[in-house]
C-alpha cells in the first residue's frame, strides 16, 4: 500500500457502513484522517459502529442528520448502495464536498496492478475465473470489490507484486474520477438497476466509467456479441480486445466448438467446467485477460476445465440418486435464467422459479422454458411465472418456499434429471438476499443426500 498524505488531518465523512464503509473508515484512520461514520442503523444494534467507536472513530447512528454536514468535512466516502439523490449526498455536492467511492479510495493507495471486471451478468464468475487462472499461472491475483472483499481492505495487505482482480458494480463505478485499471472487462450490458440509475443510458454511462482514465497502453475486453459494445468501443482510448461466440474477432472467439485466442486453439467448449452459454462468454473474457497477463494455454485450459463455478451462480452441488442439483440463486432476472437453461437438455430439467414481484411478465422466458420436464413456482411473482408456464405448455407445482420447492421437484425427478434453482427474480419477498435463498437450497440438497 502506498503512503499518501491526501487525507492527513482532513475531516472525512463515511456515509453508510456495511463492509465497504467499515473498511474505508479504518483505511482513512490509518492514513491520518479525522473520520466520522454515519450509519442509519441504531447504535445498540450496530456492532460494527461499536467496534469503530472503540478504535477512536466518531460514529453517528440511527439517522442521517443533514446538520452533520454543517461540519467542515473535506471529503465524503459514500457507500455504493446509497444513490446520488440521497439528501446527504445532495447536500455534500451542493457544498462542493468531493464525494468519493470506496473503490476510488482504494485505488488512490494501491500499488498493485488492477484488473477491473464489470457488466450486468457474469461479473462474479468471470472475476473468480480470472483470479484462479492468474494464481495457477504463478501470479498473485487477489479478489476484491463487489465480490465480498472490500477493495479498501484488500489493498492494505497488497504490494506491487500483487494483481487486484476487482469486481465492480455500476453503483461503485458511478462517480469514479481517477480510477484506472490496466485491464478492464465489461461482460455484457443489459437493462438492470434502472430504479437506481433512472435509465438504461445512465446505467451504461456508469459502467463505461471504468475506462475513463485508460489509455492505449491499457486493455479493454468487450463482448462483441452485443452491438452496444461495438459502438462503445469506438469511443475509448484503451486498446480493445473483443470476445465473441458468434463471429471470429481479433481476440477470443468460438469456432467449431473450440475456444480460440487470436488463432491459437485454447480448449474445447465442452471442456469448460461449468455449463451454459453465458459461461462460454465468461471463459472467453477470462482467456483474453489471461493471455494479456502472459499465462500459458495449458494453465488456462486446466484451470477452466477444473472450474467448479461460484456459490449461488449455477453452482453444481452434486447428485442424489442420479439427480443433479444446481444452485443458481443469483439469477435475479430473466436473462440470467435464460443463460442458465441454455446449458441443459430441457426435457431433463425441473426448474424452480419465482420471487419478488416487480410487475414483470415472463413472456420472454417462454421459448427457454418450452419443453421443460416440470416447473416448481414460488414467491410473489408465482402467478406471472405460471402464466408463462401455461403458454409454454409446461406442467407446474406450487411451493411455499425453496425447501418445499426442492422436495416437490425431487418427487418428479428421475435418474439423469436436473433440479435447477434459477428464480429469474430477486429474493426479497421471502429471503433477506439471494445468498440466504441459495443456502436453503444447499441445505435441502444436503438433507436429501443424507437420507
Swiss-Prot record:
Record-level GO cellular component terms:
cytoplasm
**Which ranges does the record mark as transmembrane?**
none
Q: Which domain of life is it from?
A: Bacteria
User: Pathway, per UniProt?
Assistant: Cell wall biogenesis; peptidoglycan biosynthesis
Q: Which reaction does it catalyse?
A: UDP-N-acetyl-alpha-D-muramoyl-L-alanine + D-glutamate + ATP = UDP-N-acetyl-alpha-D-muramoyl-L-alanyl-D-glutamate + ADP + phosphate + H(+)
Name the Pfam families on file.
Mur_ligase_C, Mur_ligase_M, MurD-like_N
Q: Which GO terms describe its biological process?
A: cell division; cell wall organization; peptidoglycan biosynthetic process; regulation of cell shape
Give binding positions for ATP. Answer: 119-125
Give the EC number(s) under which this enzyme is classified.
6.3.2.9
Q: Has keyword Cell membrane?
A: no
Q: Report keywords, A-Z.
A: ATP-binding, Cell cycle, Cell division, Cell shape, Cell wall biogenesis/degradation, Cytoplasm, Ligase, Nucleotide-binding, Peptidoglycan synthesis
GO molecular-function terms, A-Z: ATP binding; UDP-N-acetylmuramoylalanine-D-glutamate ligase activity
Query: Is Hydrolase found in the keyword set?
Result: no
Q: NCBIfam families this protein is in?
A: murD
Annotated protein name in UniProt: UDP-N-acetylmuramoylalanine--D-glutamate ligase
Q: What is the lineage of its organism?
A: Bacteria, Bacillati, Bacillota, Bacilli, Lactobacillales
